Every structure is written in C-alpha cells, then in structure tokens.
Amino acid sequence: MNTPYTDSYDRAFLLDTMMGPNAMRLTEELVAQLPIAPGMRILDLGCGKGISSILLAEKYDATVFAADLWITPDENAARFSERGLDGKIFPLRVDATKEIPFAHDYFDLIVSVDAYQYFGNNDVMLGTLLPFLKPGGHIAVAVPGFIGEYSETHLPDVVKPF
C-alpha cells in the first residue's frame, strides 16, 4: 500500500484507536485517486473511533461528519479536540439502518471503512445513501477481505489466530 501519511503517523495513537484493520491506512489508500479538495463535506459512515475522519480532516482539510452507532460522540469529540480538530470533525451517533439525519445533496463524498459490511449488506443501502451526495459526488467503501481463496488447511500464519 502507498500510505505515506499513515506511515509517518503516531503509531501509539493508531494502535490505541484501531478497532480492527488500520482504518487510517485503508482510508488513505481508498481515497488517493478521488478529487478531494479543501472544504469538502465528507460523511464518514461507521467511523468507529474516528481515525479515518482524522486523516480526511488533517490531510485533505475537509469538513468531516464522523457518524457511528457504537462509539459515543462525546468520546470521539474528545479525541478530535486533543488533535486540534474542533470545527473540522463533527461526531454524531447515527444508525445507518434507520433514518440518516442529513439534507439531500449535502456531501461531496461518503466513505465507509471496515463498517459497510455491518449495515450495507443489502440491496437498498447504496440507493439510500445516493440522495445525500451532491451531483458528481462519490461513495467509497472498503471492507475486509482476502486477495485470494484459502482452504482451512492452507491459511497464512498471520490469520490462523483469528
């Protein structure tokens, strides 16, 4: 992966805030080819502890709406404030399977990193999200997976503990 921003980030902070795969690294790779400009409004849907939101706000100077069902807005607000991101990242509690509380044509980009598989594994979620995008906006999703098929007897050593 080509992730120089993540590679130079505070490793202890990343390890303390990861809830699975390194969401900052995945986000950096995911959005590298997208036309992100300063001031864009981005919905980070299923942001967890917000490291994907932090990358989007710091690296791209975007305004990020960090939406998660399980991590409280207060917890994320404290984390964002510690990094000087008050006014750049707005933490919210959102259940994506219910009403999404935003205006239509509001976001330039909607991202979901290591979360979409929990709420979007159906035929309606993408259609539900589209009205919230501005014309020409993008939806970018990263979900965990393997590059190839593995039989149970031939799993890579790094995966066996899981």
Locate predicted features.
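Conserved alpha-helix/loop element of class I SAM-dependent methyltransferases that forms part
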Residues: 20-38
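A short acidic, Gly/Pro-enriched loop at the edge of an enzyme's catalytic core
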Residues: 100-110
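N-terminal, positively charged/glycine-rich alpha-helical extensions of SAM-dependent methyltransferases
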Residues: 1-11
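A short SAM/SAH-binding and catalytic strip from SAM-dependent methyltransferases
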Residues: 109-121
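Class I SAM-dependent methyltransferase Rossmann-like catalytic core
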Residues: 9-22
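Short, glycine-/aromatic-enriched active-site segment of Class I SAM-dependent methyltransferases
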Residues: 144-162
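Class I SAM-dependent methyltransferase SAM/SAH-binding core
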Residues: 43, 49-98
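A short glycine-rich, Lys/Arg-flanked "PGG" loop and its adjoining helix->strand segment in the class I
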Residues: 123-138
